[in-house]
Amino acid sequence: MTFVTLIKTILSAAVGAIALFSAVGADAADKVVVGYQTDALPSSVAIANGEFDKATGVKIDFRRFNSGAEIFAAIASGDVQVGYVGSSPFAAATSRGLDVKAFYLASISGVDEALVVRNGSGIETLADLKGKKLAAAPVSTDHYQLLALLKSLGLTEKDVKVFAIPQPDIVAGYNRGDLDGGFVWNPALDELRKNGKVLVTSKDVAEKGAPTFSAWVATDGFAKSHPDFLKAFAGVIAKYQSSFVADPAKWGPDSENAKALASLLGGTPADQAAGLRNLNLLPVKVQASDAWLGGGERSGLAKILKETAVFLKEQKKISDVLPSYAAFVTPDAVIAVEKGSGS
């Protein structure tokens, strides 16, 4: 399935499904479905221990997905109201007409995502990528950054074979020797490193002009109908993020937190602790600034979304770029959390 076909499939029922949810599904918020992924995040402990439910007063149905593209497909169908996604599928989905709002910035480009090349592939430096077979999850930030990296090197998909396949398939193909490398996040990142090395990180590619982020988004209808839910949800994320930053020892490989993450997400507690150390996190006060969620048209996130969309159009992955992406970003929840914390 091509990138464009996948996006069209994701969004084919988006307008009708979101409108239906807004009309009949969000009145009481007695049930909320939240999509998450396998990334190691401090707040995922709150999925495991039920603190999100307690804080919001809602029995949340948490569902795990393999990628942001899958989450946007579920949002478009009306099955999911809140989700954790990356900036590339976010830009693609909104460019196609899906109306969602980023209300919490989970992380920005760091070393938690990277291009790993296989031992024996003949790749020692970026100059060795020509003629190789690489992969990334479809419609993901990794896919976007892999293409952006190749462009910065003067290479195209004619020079390097790029496969857009799910992460489990990347790991399997890499281990068989069918792939020379993959741009991935955990747990695939740790799996690939067992027989390879990191060639370049997400942070490295961001510094070359292709920044990315991961964020929590909600459908526009849900965000308007349930601001208190989003505030409480964001408050839990901020609480666990602050705990991790203030006392990293409580999040080490032998900690209960790391064990909880491993139980929820897979891998070992040591894997999860290592993943946490690689995150690039921002406090809510910084998130609320114009550099990120605040500022309307000046919003840093809105600018990244547009820059990403422009690149995706150049690569013929989407057909349209919107004049502005400011409508898909809101600082309301993080501002409320900041005021509530007194910070």
Region spans (language model):
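Bacterial N-terminal signal peptides that target proteins for export
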Residues: M1-A13
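Sec/Tat signal peptide C-region and signal peptidase I cleavage site
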Residues: S22-A28
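Short, glycine-/small- and polar/acidic-enriched structural segments
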Residues: A29-T156, K161-D169, G173, D180-N186, ...
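Sec/Tat-exported extracytoplasmic proteins
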Residues: T56, D79, Y84, T94, ...
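Pocket-lining segment of extracytoplasmic ligand-binding domains
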Residues: S88, D169-G266
